Amino acid sequence: MSFRLRYAPSPTGFLHIGNTRTALMNYLFAKHYNGSFIVRIEDTDLARNVDGAIESQFENLNWLGIFPDESIFNVGDQKYGKYMQSQKFDRYKQLAEQLVNQNKAYRCFCSSEELEKDYEEQTSKEIIATKYSQKCLFLTQDQISQNLKDKKEYSIRFKVPQNKVWTINDIVRGDVSFDSKDLGDFVILKSNGVATYNFAVVIDDYDMQITHVLRGEEHISNTPRQMMIYDAFNWNYPKFGHLTLIVDNTGKKLSKRSGNALFFIEQYKKQGYLSQAIFNYIALLGWSPPGEQEILSQNELIKIFDEKRFSKSPSTFDMVKMKWINSVYMKKLEDNEYLEFVKSFINTNKFDITSKSEAWLNHLLLLYKKELEYAEQINDHLDLFFNKNTLDNNTIDVLNNLTNYKNVVEIFKNQINDLKDWTIENIKQIIKDTSTLANVKGKDLFMPIRIFATKSEHGPSLADVIYLLGKTTVLNNINSLER
């Protein structure tokens, strides 16, 4: 059997961590077994559809390296039907009417006001699991004919079988059972002719010959309704699996309101995260590889994927770990790849790099290759090189705690002033000579030089920073601070 798995987003929002994890796990599952990964669009909720959401889904999936074998842009065999639900309304309506004719569904003429009144009556009796009253199930054929003649609006409700239990062997959770007594007759076709989610999704999965449905745990409650529909058509079920929640550091479901994490994939792109790092990290949310290795390429993840290794517990989205994994991938880039990538994230409105040579800029950026967690972070380090640093009182306190710092600075300044050949090796030698002449070392040597020469307590290799600042800037910094 060829495995066919799908990711089926609604265009009501943009690609985020949660639905990326769903897409990614389906992709890994399909590719591990040399199967097909399908993306279809579930756009029946027309009022909530967002402009640009479909494009966001595909652009960001492709950026992450998740390429569908079939989609609205890459249509498969015609036997699989359409890849967008709004193009299948006739198909859904035909099958809903078929169930009515087979006495497995019925027309419901109840108005929204009648349904609301029914709901209020049940809640007033403290009924927790409210259900449809089945009022229209018992209409006579004459009543139905009269309603149709009067052109009274109706939806189509599925008739839930009585006294039946459905059990699935969930890929993630094991056996899960559902009892029909907990479910009321539900709408499968709304009065506007649009199929409901549970009806459309079953037809789509059947038409596309989906073998495994892997999705978020919020869909568990939909599963019994979908199984009933499969049974009504005498269709075989796919294999179901429900991934556990992704939570934030407070234990709440990860959302755009989670303060500790970026939620949308587009945000990671804009901050300069690498797509392969995000792919790697999200693959570890609710799934664990064998062994201790956590830095895994897409091909490695496909090779070692095992659906038996899904977690039954919620997974916490750890922004610190996300940054760490991205920093590992940043370090693995070739220097030319790293430079091209990071340059595109420099804030050129704040830092005028046009006045600098390419060699100078490359030298500067490579100093931070082992430090950056994401590319946009480079802007946190550039004040140092564009004379935008200011010292505070804490820095003055640091100086006052050092041994004879004024002598150290004076010796260093005189030697820098006399230096003719401006190279890193010569600057390193001057620092050594200053140590000997001032009879200091360690913090008493480096801190005064760093603060006066660079106007900062912190930074990468001192000799490299001094070299990049240039002789004139270094002497100006020292003179301004001495005053």
From Swiss-Prot:
Q: Where is this motif: 'HIGH' region?
A: 9-19
GO MF annotations for this entry?
ATP binding; glutamate-tRNA ligase activity; tRNA binding; zinc ion binding
Q: Which UniProt keywords apply?
A: Aminoacyl-tRNA synthetase, ATP-binding, Cytoplasm, Ligase, Nucleotide-binding, Protein biosynthesis
- List the GO terms this entry assigns under cellular component, sorted alphabetically: cytosol
Which InterPro entries does this chain map to? aa-tRNA-synth_I_cd-bd, aa-tRNA-synth_I_codon-bd_sub2, aa-tRNA-synth_I_CS, aa_tRNA-synth_I_cd-bd_sf, Glu-tRNA-ligase_bac/mito, Glu/Gln-tRNA-synth, Glu/Gln-tRNA-synth_Ib_cat-dom, GluQ/Sye
Keyword Cytoplasm part of the UniProt annotation: yes
Give the residues the record marks as binding ATP: K256
* Protein biosynthesis keyword on record: yes
- What's the top EC group for this one? ligase
Pfam families associated with the record: Anticodon_2, tRNA-synt_1c
Q: What is its EC number?
A: 6.1.1.17
The protein's annotated catalytic reaction(s) are: tRNA(Glu) + L-glutamate + ATP = L-glutamyl-tRNA(Glu) + AMP + diphosphate
One of the GO biological process terms: glutamyl-tRNA aminoacylation
Q: Which positions are tagged coiled coil? A: none
Which compartments does it reside in? Cytoplasm
**'KMSKS' region: where is this motif?**
253-257
Q: What does this protein do?
A: Catalyzes the attachment of glutamate to tRNA(Glu) in a two-step reaction: glutamate is first activated by ATP to form Glu-AMP and then transferred to the acceptor end of tRNA(Glu).
Instruction: Summarize subunit and interaction data from the UniProt record for this chain.
Output: Monomer.
Q: What's this protein's family per the entry? A: Belongs to the class-I aminoacyl-tRNA synthetase family. Glutamate--tRNA ligase type 1 subfamily.
What's the protein called, per UniProt? Answer: Glutamate--tRNA ligase
Query: Which species is the source of this protein?
Result: Mycoplasma mycoides subsp. mycoides SC (strain CCUG 32753 / NCTC 10114 / PG1)
